[in-house]
Curated annotation (Swiss-Prot):
It comes from Thermoanaerobacter pseudethanolicus (strain ATCC 33223 / 39E) (Clostridium thermohydrosulfuricum). Residues 73-106 are annotated as: Domain II. SMART domains: AAA, Bac_DnaA_C. Transmembrane segments: none annotated. ATP binds at G151, G153, K154, T155. Its main location: cytoplasm. The lineage of its organism: Bacteria, Bacillati, Bacillota, Clostridia, Thermoanaerobacterales. NCBIfam families: DnaA (TIGR00362), PRK14086.1 (NF010686). The gene is dnaA. InterPro entries: AAA+_ATPase (IPR003593), Chromosome_initiator_DnaA (IPR001957), Chromosome_initiator_DnaA-like (IPR020591), Chromosome_initiator_DnaA_CS (IPR018312), DnaA_C (IPR013159), DnaA_dom (IPR013317), DnaA_N_dom (IPR024633), DnaA_N_sf (IPR038454). This is Chromosomal replication initiator protein DnaA.
Length: 443
């Protein structure tokens, strides 16, 4: 029922702009929005009847001619104002169809909208970029790459983009998927000989929202397939939004051709929320859940839980659950009692084993390989970084650190001096070390 009216209107606008002065276009025609194509009738909308009458009186023939030139087809043009019943009927019909389409393509969390996202200094660039993408898919930033640690709101923003487009745009096919799901579906398509079906699913959409892209590192076939999916969508002027726990340059074993494409658009980071933002997040959560939480309790939680939004909200839920179970009112003493285990665990003990595990996770290598005698660069270099961090973050002696790695103390000295010197010259390595320190310390 509905044609690809947005792309057709974009082509028509290019012709119109070449034939009108900027003043004429920006005064009247800029307000026109494509609504739908139904049985070769191109429905356009204007904000009010006055604008509609001006366009019908002065510019309708220009629009007809431009449509013919741009499409080599004779469309009937019908302009509706947004206060007309016919406009509302078509809009409602489109929204119903979009809702059906979007739910078959992917499931979006109804709680993850722009309205429920708390904006602060730590995330305002990412929020603004996501909103711009949602308002004008494939026109603002394409691709948009957002990165940050676990629980900071990346997935929330991606779902918010999907919800906003569903609500405000017509006819868009939106796909939200994690890179793990993408990989699993690819594996199944190969196993079941359904490659073409898989490609059609991911390449015949308008917006691709792919979460946790770092997990495709080391998966050569997945990277190959995603490379071609990316190219197909990008060349068709479709919006791509990617999230990761780190910027493209820091994703190990990511193919350079993918890395460069991820950097074509805008890269926006999300940092852990500052104190004021943590307070705002807690107040928003309390408001959403209809909870009456004293300000001093919110302040205590915001002071003690600094790592991410997920832990902040989890702490608040824990306090409420504790209150319900003990039949006690929520006050500062109850909050301290409810969170005593969480707060005490924040000062985690840093061991060499913990450092090894975090470094392995960060560089996507197996712990058994890390502790083996393998000397390949992708294992030896992270091992040297782990030795450096063990020297920096623990009070262990050099021989003891060496023993934890199955090496002697001279190897630890060499690793420490090497990484110390490289940090001074390599900004990327310096950022990686700082990120690893945060992860090891638990915030």
């Amino acid at each position: 029922m509905y044609g690809d009216h947005r792309q057709i209107w974009e082509r028509i606008v290019e012709v119109i702009k070449s034939e009108l002065t900027p003043t004429s276009y920006n005064t009247w025609l800029v307000h026109i929005k494509p609504l739908a194509i139904i049985d070769d009738v191109l429905f356009l909308s204007t904000p009010n009847t006055f604008t509609k009458n001006i366009i019908n009186g002065r510019y309708i023939n220009i629009i007809y001619d431009a449509a013919s030139k741009a499409t080599n087809k004779l469309y009937e043009i019908k302009i509706l104002s947004e206060d007309e019943e016919e406009y509302r009927e078509i809009k409602e019909s489109i929204e119903k169809e979009n809702l059906t389409e979007s739910t078959t393509l992917s499931t979006l969390n109804p709680k993850y909208t722009f309205d429920t996202f708390v904006v602060g200094n730590s995330n305002k660039l990412a929020h603004a970029a996501c909103l711009a993408v949602a308002q004008a898919p494939a026109k603002a930033y394409n691709p948009l790459f957002i990165y940050g640690g676990v629980g900071l709101g990346k997935t929330h923003l991606m779902h918010a983009i999907g919800h906003f487009i569903n609500k405000h745009q017509s006819g868009y096919k939106i796909m939200y998927v994690t890179s793990e799901t993408f990989t699993n579906e690819l594996v199944n398509s190969i196993k079941d000989d359904k490659n073409e079906e898989f490609r059609n699913k991911y390449r015949n959409i308008d917006v691709l929202l792919i979460d946790d892209i770092q997990f495709i590192a080391k998966k050569e076939r997945t990277q190959e397939e995603f490379f071609h999916t990316f190219n197909t969508l990008y060349e068709a002027n479709k919006q791509i939004v990617i999230s990761s726990d780190r910027p493209p340059k820091e994703i190990p074993t990511l193919e350079e051709r993918l890395r460069s494409r991820f950097e074509w658009g805008l890269i926006a980071d999300i940092q852990p929320p500052d104190y004021e933002t943590r307070i705002a997040i807690l107040k928003k959560k309390a408001q959403t859940e209809n909870l009456n939480i004293p300000d001093e309790v919110l302040a205590y939680v915001a002071e003690k839980i600094q790592s991410n939004i997920r832990e902040l909200e989890g702490a608040l839920i824990r306090i409420v659950a504790f209150s319900n179970l003990t039949k006690a009112n929520i006050d500062l003493e109850l909050a301290k009692h409810a969170l005593k285990e969480i707060v005490s665990n924040k000062t985690r003990e840093i061991t060499v084993k913990l450092i090894q595990e975090e470094v392995c996770k960060y560089y996507n290598i197996k712990l058994e390989d890390f502790r083996s005698r393998k000397r390949t660069k992708n294992i030896a270099y992270p091992r040297q970084i782990a030795m450096y961090l063990a020297r920096e973050l623990t009070d262990l002696s050099l021989p003891k650190i060496g023993e934890e790695f199955g090496k002697d103390h001279t190897t630890v000295i060499h690793a420490y001096e090497k990484i110390s010197n490289e940090i001074k010259q390599d900004e990327l390595l310096s950022r990686q070390i700082e990120e690893l320190k945060k992860r090891i310390k638990g915030y």
